[in-house]
Amino acid sequence: MSLPGSFDLTPEDAKLLLAANVHLGSKNVQVHNKPYVYKTRPDGVNVINVGKTWEKIVLAARIIAAIPNAADVAVCSTRTFGQRAVLKFAAHTGATPIAGRFTPGNFTNYITRSFKEPRLVVVTDPRTDFQAIKESSYVNIPVIALTDMDSPSEYVDVAIPCNNKGKHSIGLIWWLVAREVLRLRGIIPDRTTEWSVMPDLYFYRDPEEIEQNATEDIKTDDVEEAPAADAETEWTGETEEVDWAESGATPAAEEAAASNW
């Protein structure tokens, strides 16, 4: 697919794709994914052509931007590494997120509370999001998917070849698609203007690690504040003024002093 010059892959974006290991595919190759293989390494890992990955990112963004109502785009991720990216993508583009387990009947059973009628479905992995793709095929909804070299391609209309198992790779692909959608909608004025949102925002973060870091920060703050409080008490505390002449006199002592010995 030939793109206009303004849509060419920039060196900065190419570095991001390589740094996030987007080009490292699986060792097995599904027959429909062979055109996306650049070469096979001696260890058996198939290297993905990032140029074709970029072409599919632009194509997917143009399809998403062509839908008038942004909420008619459903973005799904059963895979844990893609759930944060899906939620951030929905927040920035206005799409409808389905993060976590996909409830069977979301697209086909109108009696359920979670029933949806999207015009487009975007999934993180065709293997883990098979239920969403299967139901989309029943009701004729086009599907865009992030596909690895061993991912099934049945009922997938647009495949974005990439490493869909790494948290950095998944987050970066969703970030690039969101940025292209905002550019096509005119929210980002031109292609020379940088998006203020960093790719790190789309990366998966372990909740236990976040909680542990927060606990360590609290402990560090307590340790730093405690000596300061002690020093303030020691050097700036005021001592009570005591009149020793009055404090030493008791009624018994005064009576003894007044008596005639």
Curated annotation (Swiss-Prot):
Biological-process GO terms, alphabetical: ribosomal small subunit assembly; translation
Q: Where in the cell is it found?
A: Cytoplasm
Q: Can you list the disulfide-bonded cysteine pairs?
A: none
Residue ranges of region Disordered?
A: 214-261
Superkingdom of origin organism:
Eukaryota
GO cellular component terms given for this protein = cytosolic small ribosomal subunit
Which InterPro entries does UniProt cross-reference here?
A: Ribosomal_uS2, Ribosomal_uS2_CS, Ribosomal_uS2_euk, Ribosomal_uS2_euk/arc, Ribosomal_uS2_flav_dom_sf
The answer to keyword RNA-binding applying to this record is: no
Compositionally biased region (Acidic residues)? 222-244
Keyword list (alphabetical) reads: Acetylation, Cytoplasm, Ribonucleoprotein, Ribosomal protein
Where is this chain compositionally biased, Low complexity type? 245-261
For this protein, the record's Pfam families field holds: Ribosomal_S2 (PF00318)
Molecular function as annotated in GO: structural constituent of ribosome
Assembly behavior:
Component of the small ribosomal subunit. Mature ribosomes consist of a small (40S) and a large (60S) subunit. The 40S subunit contains about 33 different proteins and 1 molecule of RNA (18S). The 60S subunit contains about 49 different proteins and 3 molecules of RNA (25S, 5.8S and 5S). Interacts with RPS21.
What exactly does this protein do?
Answer: Required for the assembly and/or stability of the 40S ribosomal subunit. Required for the processing of the 20S rRNA-precursor to mature 18S rRNA in a late step of the maturation of 40S ribosomal subunits.
What is the similarity comment for this entry?
Belongs to the universal ribosomal protein uS2 family.
Kindly provide the name given to this protein in its UniProt entry: Small ribosomal subunit protein uS2
Native organism = Debaryomyces hansenii (strain ATCC 36239 / CBS 767 / BCRC 21394 / JCM 1990 / NBRC 0083 / IGC 2968)
